[in-house]
Amino acid sequence: MEYLPIFIDLKNRPVLVVGGGAVAARKIHMLQRATITIVAPALCTELKKVLIKQNISWISKNFQPIMLNKVILVIVATNDSKLNTFIYQNAEKHNILINTVDDKNKCSFIFPAIIDRNPVLIGISSCGKAPILVRILREKLELLLPKSLGFVAKLAGAWRNKVKQHIVDTVLRRQFWEKIFYNGHVVTLMEKGRPKEANKVLNYALNNSVKNKNNKTGHVTLVGAGPGDIGLLTIRGLQVIQQADIILYDYLVNSDILDLARRDADKICVGKHVGNHSISQKKLNQFIVQLAQKGNKVVRLKGGDPFIFGRGGEELQAISEAGIAFQVVPGITAGIGVAAYSGIPLTHRKYAHSVVFITGHNTNGDNQFNWNSLSNNQQTLVIYMGKINAISIRNNLIIHGRNMHTPVAVISRGTYQDQKILIGTLIELEKLTQMADHPALLVIGDVVSLHSKINWFGQKALHYYLINSIINLI
């Protein structure tokens, strides 16, 4: 983070503005609560009007370093480069915050693009890197956020102390406000200009919450985080993550997804590496139950989809037996997401009429799978965690009739920017997996031959696509 985004109360604090043109006038509009002194030999018409309306001092002289005395912040809005440098050097010498308009190198702070729903304020910045992108984001957010948002915030502020007095427990208090805002009823009433009814709803909710304050019950949500790319997390998954008190996550979960959680949420890695289980499944099940019994909103965050080779069913059995409330948010499983990002359609009228998902962990045992069925040349075989037993997989498939020249893809870091795809044939599977990183997904079938024609994720236009996706999502 190049800049610290902070909101400063400038009420009655001394601020110096150097410059008397239209740019200075625009900046002064944001500093209305401050005690402003303008330094400029002459003022534009707009500033003269502002001078009459507001309590602003004007020094009709050239800038002198002594004018910085007792000032906490300086805005420089002149087109004199030498003067701007001189002011900047003096401000830096005295550790005074300074912003030189349109000259980032002479700034100790910069102004963000602002969305004002007083008292709700949103500042957006690219740290001076992409001002047009920031402008577009601001425009999108302006349309997205209701004009009544400020009234909702003021209403919440009016109730804040009363709620704090009646709900002493901080967790319960936060959950109360989450219910109010997520439910949307109060917001809708304020949008319609019906504050009296909104107050009644708040009063009813508070009384009801006080009656049930001893019934502090937690619950567990099993969430599929998708195969890696943060953009593949579902909207429902995002909502649940942002409400969680505790997140128990697998080591494969993208750290960017964890950053979406509340800052005060506990994030605990309970994942398993190949051959290295930090916690047994039985103990993990007990741990989840214990956390929920303490009244926490627990999110069990798993890579891919929790019900496909994720042991989600085992965990929910334990949670259900303990009488804990739970829900499931599906995710895009690696077999589907990674194949799509590799330009490999799992079914195709010409090449494959079915697809089978298996785990490669237990493929050493000859009786573990129906190899005759898996060796069908008209189907696609997707193998999770198949790197370790690649030799056994290859041998069993060929022995049971799969063509040794069947196209194969070994994909690691699937859906990430550094995704690695190794293409070969079934007879070469051992060599391919040796070159791949853990964990790796194996795709076996004639559909792999389409990779070279429809591998979209490696295209030059990718970055444009990603930026467009961000803007369109907002």
Curated annotation (Swiss-Prot):
InterPro entries: 4pyrrol_Mease (IPR000878), 4pyrrol_Methylase_sf (IPR035996), 4pyrrole_Mease_sub1 (IPR014777), 4pyrrole_Mease_sub2 (IPR014776), CobA/CysG_C (IPR006366), NAD(P)-bd_dom_sf (IPR036291), Siro_Cobalamin_biosynth (IPR050161), Sirohaem_synt_dimer_dom_sf (IPR037115). It comes from Blochmanniella pennsylvanica (strain BPEN). The modification Phosphoserine is found at S126. Residues 218-474 are annotated as: Uroporphyrinogen-III C-methyltransferase. Its EC number is 2.1.1.107, 1.3.1.76, 4.99.1.4. The keyword S-adenosyl-L-methionine applies. In the N-terminal section; belongs to the precorrin-2 dehydrogenase / sirohydrochlorin ferrochelatase family. In the C-terminal section; belongs to the precorrin methyltransferase family. The lineage of its organism: Bacteria, Pseudomonadati, Pseudomonadota, Gammaproteobacteria, Enterobacterales. It catalyses: uroporphyrinogen III + 2 S-adenosyl-L-methionine = precorrin-2 + 2 S-adenosyl-L-homocysteine + H(+); precorrin-2 + NAD(+) = sirohydrochlorin + NADH + 2 H(+); siroheme + 2 H(+) = sirohydrochlorin + Fe(2+). Pathway: Cofactor biosynthesis; adenosylcobalamin biosynthesis; precorrin-2 from uroporphyrinogen III: step 1/1; Cofactor biosynthesis; adenosylcobalamin biosynthesis; sirohydrochlorin from precorrin-2: step 1/1; Porphyrin-containing compound metabolism; siroheme biosynthesis; precorrin-2 from uroporphyrinogen III: step 1/1; Porphyrin-containing compound metabolism; siroheme biosynthesis; siroheme from sirohydrochlorin: step 1/1. The active site is at D250 (proton acceptor), K272 (proton donor). PROSITE patterns: SUMT_1, SUMT_2. GO terms for biological process: cobalamin biosynthetic process; methylation; siroheme biosynthetic process. Then it catalyzes the NAD-dependent ring dehydrogenation of precorrin-2 to yield sirohydrochlorin. Finally, it catalyzes the ferrochelation of sirohydrochlorin to yield siroheme. This is Siroheme synthase. NAD(+) binds at A22, V23, P41, A42. PANTHER family: SIROHEME SYNTHASE, SIROHEME SYNTHASE-RELATED.
